[in-house]
From Swiss-Prot:
It is an enzyme of class 5 (isomerase). Forms a cylinder of 14 subunits composed of two heptameric rings stacked back-to-back. Interacts with the co-chaperonin GroES. InterPro entries: Chaperonin_Cpn60_CS, Cpn60/GroEL, Cpn60/GroEL/TCP-1, GroEL-like_apical_dom_sf, GROEL-like_equatorial_sf, TCP-1-like_intermed_sf. This is Chaperonin GroEL. ATP binds at residues 30-33, 51, 87-91, 415, 479-481, 495. The keyword Ion transport does not apply.
Length: 540
């Protein structure tokens, strides 16, 4: 086992604070409307330019092991805030740095670290409750657009696009961000349910100009099996032909003789048919087929439940107003499924989302909810160069997370004002002893840090502005973009309550651990001499 380097007490804490400061100073220059860019070197390709706090934090590794431990712990704050609310990473880092710096000063002055931590925790619990009372629901498009604009670093077009997307696909709808092809940002909305499987044969195409299959009011056959024998399908095909409607077959696969016969029938105009593979794999495919069945009012023909394809009737088939199939995707528009059944299915999937353990599963389940409940919107980000595209895409992603958080828990006044008001409200808070009271003061003083940093990045004097804001009340604050004071809500400067709350909770959690650190252990660096000795046997 390698020899260890151990540091105790103040020696350890000073080193740790140095690491915290290096990381936090790099991250906090990005805060606010006048935040600066950070350029990150990449081992290949052009450097990345970003104003996203967590992207900066992730890049930082320090040479000194003890300093690096401090930096990595604050990196955890940014990552956790990002995972919980998708934004507020810089705010969380600034808060953590402020609490750690003030807390370690108090420890150096002889306060009991455990009592300090208890005081900080008490202040944060009270602050979270206070934030909830200040929170205003965020339901209209205007407020959603404002939240998106602030989070995308004051880019109004992004805010408007996100609000429009939420308008089209509902609060539950899936909104994805992709690379655009032009210079402008675009919004692409897919109504109905879309999945990424295309036609099994190009001979099904009936709209050559678009290279797609478009079927009006078709029957939809859902089969959880491979179909290769046409005899199994004859009864259904005959019934559909009599009804004079087209047929869409969604099965695990349609191959060989069965596919050839369907193609011949289509080309001769006997019955309009199109076949596609079912989306997903394994259990997920079964679940998605069931989703489509619920949406279209059909039944999945599955041998697991004793149903045979030969015995399927028109009653077992789903229906929709229109189905559009191209090379890679299938879209079912206006399925005739009962609203009650669809809502029941959505509720069932939501329950699974709550119980999901992996992010991947959760994401897939949320996509299924969106496809059943609303639709899918794609924001295509336009930019002149790839470097700009990456930077802009990261901002749009942040803005999207922020607006979702705002819809979930409401909004508070932005620009660091909400935390200043909370701190003022809790000024009279006391605990069991003097050291705990100091802990409360440390947390309350740190709550001013985001406002001060926003002002500092805008090139103004933080103390002057902070005092002016504290002299006001309610939503009165400082708009760093226009350098004027006024009502932050009227200025359209809003922060999602969830983002502010998460930032404060995670910052206090990690800061509390660091303040109560008494010893740090790391591997001793191997001496250069030992390295040279190891390489000595390599004669030329």
């Amino acid at each position: 086992m390698a020899a260890k380097d151990v540091k105790f007490g103040n020696d350890a804490r000073v080193k740790m604070l140095r690491g915290v400061n290096v990381l936090a100073d790099a991250v906090k220059v990005t805060l606010g409307p006048k935040g600066r860019n950070v350029v990150l070197d990449k081992s290949f390709g052009a450097p990345t330019i970003t104003k996203d706090g967590v992207s900066v934090a992730r890049e930082i590794e320090l040479e000194d092991k003890f300093e690096n431990m401090g930096a990595q712990m604050v990196k955890e704050v940014a990552s956790k805030a990002n995972d919980a609310a998708g934004d507020g990473t810089t705010t969380a880092t600034v808060l953590a740095q402020a609490i750690i710096a003030e807390g370690l000063k108090a420890v150096a002055a002889g306060m009991n670290p455990m009592d300090l931590k208890r005081g900080i925790d008490k202040a944060v619990v009270a602050a979270v409750e206070e934030l909830k009372t200040l929170s205003v629901p965020c339901s209209d498009s205007k407020a959603i657009a404002q939240v998106g604009t602030i989070s995308a670093n004051s880019d109004e077009t992004v805010g408007k696009l996100i609000a429009e997307a939420m308008d089209k696909v509902g609060k539950e709808g899936v909104i994805t961000v992709e690379d655009g092809t032009g210079l402008e940002d675009e919004l692409d909305v897919v109504e109905g349910m879309q999945f990424d499987r295309g036609y099994l044969s190009p001979y099904f195409i009936n709209k050559p100009e678009t290279g797609a299959v478009e079927l009006e009011s078709p029957f939809i056959l859902l089969a959880d099996k491979k179909v290769s024998n046409i005899r199994e399908m004859l009864p259904v095909l005959e019934a559909v032909a009599k009804a004079g409607k087209p047929l869409v077959i969604i099965a695990e696969d349609v191959e060989g003789e069965a596919l050839a016969t369907l193609v011949v029938n289509t080309m001769r105009g006997i019955v309009k048919v199109a076949a596609v593979k079912a989306p997903g794999f394994g259990d997920r495919r079964k679940a998605m087929l069931q989703d489509i069945a619920t949406l279209t009012g059909g039944t999945v023909i599955s041998e697991e439940i004793g149903m045979e394809l030969e015995k399927a009737t028109l009653e077992d088939l789903g229906q929709a107003k229109r189905v559009v199939i191209n090379k890679d995707t299938t879209t079912i528009i206006d399925g005739v499924g009962e609203e009650g059944a669809i809502q029941g299915r959505v509720a069932q999937i939501r329950k699974q989302i709550e119980e999901a353990t992996s992010d991947y599963d959760r994401e897939k389940l949320q996509e299924r909810v969106a496809k059943l409940a609303g639709g899918v919107a794609v924001i295509k980000v336009g930019a002149a160069t790839e470097v700009e595209m990456k930077e802009k895409k990261a901002r749009v992603d942040d803005a999207l997370h922020a607006t979702r958080a705002a819809v979930e828990e409401g909004v508070v006044a932005g620009g660091g004002v909400a935390l200043v008001r909370v701190a003022a409200k809790l000024a009279g808070l006391t605990a069991q002893n003097e050291d705990q009271n100091v802990g409360i003061k440390v947390a309350l003083r740190a709550m001013e840090a985001p406002l001060r940093q926003i002002v500092s990045n805008a090139g103004e004097e933080p103390s002057v502005v902070a005092n002016n804001v504290k002299a006001g009340e309610g939503n009165y604050g400082y708009n760093a973009a226009t350098e004027e004071y006024g009502n932050m809500i009227d200025f359209g400067i809003l922060d999602p309550t969830k983002v502010t709350r998460s930032a404060l909770q995670y910052a206090a959690s990690v800061a509390g651990l660091m303040i109560t650190t008494e010893c740090m252990v790391t591997d001793l660096p191997k001496s250069d001499a030992a390295d040279l000795g190891a390489a000595g046997g390599m004669g030329g």
